[in-house]
Swiss-Prot record:
Alphabetical keyword list: DNA-directed RNA polymerase, Nucleotidyltransferase, Transcription, Transferase
Protein name stated in the entry: DNA-directed RNA polymerase subunit omega
A molecular function GO annotation: DNA-directed RNA polymerase activity
Alphabetical list of InterPro entries matching this protein: DNA-dir_RNA_pol_omega (IPR003716), Pol_omega/Rpo6/RPB6 (IPR006110), RPB6/omega-like_sf (IPR036161)
Gene behind the chain: rpoZ
Region spans: Disordered: 90-109
Amino acid sequence: MARVTVEDCIDKVDNRFELVLLAGHRARQISQGAQITVDRDNDKNPVVALREIAEETLSPADLKEDLIHSLQKHVEVDEPEMASEFISHSSEAGGVLGTSSEEEGSSFDHMSEEELLAGIEGLVVPEKSDDY
């Protein structure tokens, strides 16, 4: 079997650095047990990944999406419908605890500046320890 080079795959993925990232990601998937889409022919995983990209058995866009998803630490999930349903139901029912929405907005305690300063003066400073 002829060797697979970056030149064989560069027409599928425009940027050679992106190609290396995608092929490396696919090679790691193969080593973790993912199903290969071409004959192995006793090749190593990076070569199989490059052959899959060159023969277009995998979509580079799908590989890129999967790579991005695997690198994300926090995935945001949009659920605006649930929040709007809860708000509309609670406003119709008079609130969760039986209070109206106008009462909930004004339920905060209001303190004067003097009360805040008196509260700050009443705080006790913790003793210094060797923990830090």
